[in-house]
A protein has these predicted regions:
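General beta-strand structural signal in soluble alpha/beta enzymes
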Residues: 60-64
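Conserved active-site carboxylates
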Residues: 67
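N-terminal lobe of the biotin/lipoate ligase/transferase fold
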Residues: 1-54, 204
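Long, positively charged amphipathic alpha-helical accessory segments at protein N-termini or as interdomain linkers
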Residues: 38, 42-59, 70-205
Length: 205
């Protein structure tokens, strides 16, 4: 569960000192359509946020679509990759910063860890068990109950909603999560649904 670097979204690396992070991958054969599989990313984010909050006592929030934040800084990240072998699979990669006290200069203003935030010192094995339990629960609910329960829980944890943001070429105030998992922006010309991209916050809307 420890490595020097992992791979994050947009080809970035996940920096780690050995034993200082929980880095894990879960192989899933989704019981849902290919079109619905991006919602698994949101389910993973909710599961990680709940697990971290439960084990550390920290006030954890979500940045669309799946960054896990504490006080606006990234504590955990998620990457999903699809593969087609005999049957389609999804590899769910999760990285949670636990014991880091410092980060590289490029990350110092945006990254954090459980230790830096003063959270309870959860062990990696303990957190792994709680993450897997929460992930299995939310994946099962998504497959059996549809998106509505997950959407409600994601919105309850969302840090992005209400903020003025830029996502790619789109700028506006994030106001909702659509039924397909897209981020809904309020712009001068109306509502814009954004399905992919990195959220860059500008100010509170």
């Amino acid at each position: 569960m420890g490595m020097w670097v992992g791979r994050g979204r947009w080809g970035r690396v996940w920096h780690d000192e050995p034993q200082h992070s929980l880095l894990m991958s879960v192989i899933v054969r989704p019981g849902m359509s290919v079109a619905d599989q991006p919602k698994l990313s949101l389910a993973t984010a909710v599961a990680v946020a709940e697990a971290v909050g439960l084990t550390t006592g920290l006030n954890v929030k979500l940045k669309w679509p799946n960054d896990v934040l504490v006080d606006g800084r990234k504590l955990a990240g998620i990457l999903l990759e699809s593969r087609v072998v005999a049957k389609p699979i999804v590899i769910v990669g999760i990285g949670v910063n636990l014991r880091q006290r410092t980060f590289p200069h490029a990350l110092a203003a945006t990254a954090t860890s459980v230790d830096l935030e003063g959270g309870r010192a959860a062990g990696r094995e303990e957190l792994l068990e709680v993450v897997l339990d929460a992930f299995d629960r939310w994946r099962t609910r998504l497959e059996n109950e549809g998106f509505a329960p997950l959407r409600a829980r994601w919105l309850a944890l969302a840090d992005t909603i209400g903020r003025a943001v830029t996502v790619g070429e789109h700028a506006g105030v994030a106001v909702d999560l659509a039924d397909d998992g897209a981020l809904v922006l309020r712009q001068a010309c109306g509502l814009q649904h954004v399905v992919a991209g990195e959220v860059i916050e500008s100010r509170r809307g």
